[in-house]
Amino acid sequence: MTIRDIAKAAGVSPATVSLVLNNKSGVSEERRQVIQRLLTQNGYEKRCHDKSSLNILFVKYVQYGTIVEHNGDFINRVLDGLQDEADKLRINLTMRNLNSHHFDEIMDCFKTGGYHGSIILGTELDDAFAQKLEHSPIPTVVLDNMVENYELDSVVMDNRGCAFSGVRYLIECGHRKIGFVKSKYDISNFHQRYEGYRSALEKHDIPFEEKYVFEVEPTMHGAYHDMLNALSKGRELPTSFFAGNDSMGAGVVKALKQYSYRVPEQISMIGIDDLPFCSISDPMLTTMAIPKETMGRMAVRRMYEKVLGDSQECIKKLLYPHLVERESVAKL
């Protein structure tokens, strides 16, 4: 049984069950005993929330592998923020990997592993798994995915706003033929960035042209080869691209240069992430920088609030990126 099921059986709200599970006040003794009996019968362990001994499980969820496993720089910076905030709050942080085939295993771990809460790296999180997470027996915060349609706390970049701002910058630089480097994998973040791109064009009365959307693997190597294939077919090119991430942008730039296109003189490029290679690539890549460490710190802080019962509302936190101007965008 999930927390919601137990709440229904006991005739109380899920929040009341959470109070008992987390050994908090605010529940009558008679009702507490009923709820505790149901919790025990279903394998839930009462947790003692001494502020000096909170145990949080960080789960790196992998659905495709291509996106998460090829973005180690991004993830490592997020982890730096997670660990830094956990150390400040005296939280024990345990890390595990998870794919869609091991959901039952991780739910058992939530129930019996002695964890007070979990933080899920949800970059590749799909709807099916998000729906299951809504019934998590412990407080859960999703990182790097808005999980818009689900009652789950989240900390994520404003993907739509980020893409909108990046495309607006290209427009301010004089570009009207603006393409989009789109991931073949339609995860939430990439989809929202595409929406932001479309929205910016519409806002500035620039017609959307499907021919300027190039689908590639969301890795530098994959984007390079997919763009080479597109160029070999003689596809018409815009004067600039907004890429769904830096890796795709860099891969496309490499392919363009191999076909003797000059970047940014002939074709400009802007990405998202501000990964380390952006400052040493040729040309150095203009990008929208994500506050990665801040994302990690905010996820831990939000989990801390939930576990201690300071805030039980579902809160979704958006972080706004900022533009880092380098060498890959030309003014027309």
Give the label of every model feature segment.
Residues 1-53:
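N-terminal helix-turn-helix DNA-binding module of bacterial transcription factors
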Residues 13, 45, 116, 176-177, ...:
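Short acidic/polar active-site loop segments enriched in Thr and Asp
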Residues 38, 81-85, 132, 192-204, ...:
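Alpha-helical structural signal in soluble globular domains
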Residues 55-168, 172, 231-232, 236, ...:
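Alpha-helical recognition/docking segments in bacterial nutrient-uptake
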Residues 59-61, 121, 143, 180-181, ...:
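Short hydrophobic segments within beta-strands
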Residues 61-76, 95-103, 155-165, 181-228, ...:
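Hinge/beta->alpha junction and helix N-cap segments in small-molecule ligand-binding domains
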Residues 226-332:
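Flexible loop/turn connectors
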